[in-house]
Design a protein with these regions (language model features):
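N-terminal Rossmann-like NAD(P)+-binding subdomain of aldehyde/semialdehyde dehydrogenases
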Residues: 1-126
């Protein structure tokens, strides 16, 4: 393993200060988890960036279009061979102390809640 960013922000948004945490997985691999150090200014700037992206891009999508994008991402995460899922299955137990088999089961169960038909049910309920 190596350095792993454990955050997500709009592509054009840049964090300036980071913290790290070194973890060792049960297989002996190590990783440095990197995450932004947030202060009020960073949170306000990030919120403004998210609002701008919503107005410029997301607002153009239909509800079905948004559901489709989320459903495609969920399909990736339900695949046990998806590289990001495999990485999560190695790192989450090291960070949380949860048993690796429970993490695998719960990731699968959790992701299934966001498949297309379930998302459409959520939307219909709202």
């Amino acid at each position: 393993m190596s350095d792993v960013d454990i955050f997500h922000a709009p592509r054009d948004f840049e964090f300036h200060d980071f913290d790290t945490r070194n973890v060792t997985a049960s297989d002996g691999g190590t990783a440095t988890l990197r995450f932004p150090r947030l202060d009020a200014d960073a949170v306000h700037a990030l919120a403004a960036s998210v609002r701008r992206h919503r107005a410029e891009k997301l607002a153009r999508y239909s509800t079905d279009g948004i559901v489709d994008v989320i459903a495609r991402a969920v399909e990736l995460w339900t695949d046990p061979e998806y590289p990001e899922r495999r990485l999560a299955e190695r790192l989450i137990p090291a960070v949380t102390g949860y048993d690796a088999s429970m993490v695998r089961i719960e990731l699968k169960r959790y992701m299934r809640m966001f498949r297309r038909r379930e998302l459409l049910r959520f939307v219909d309920d709202e």
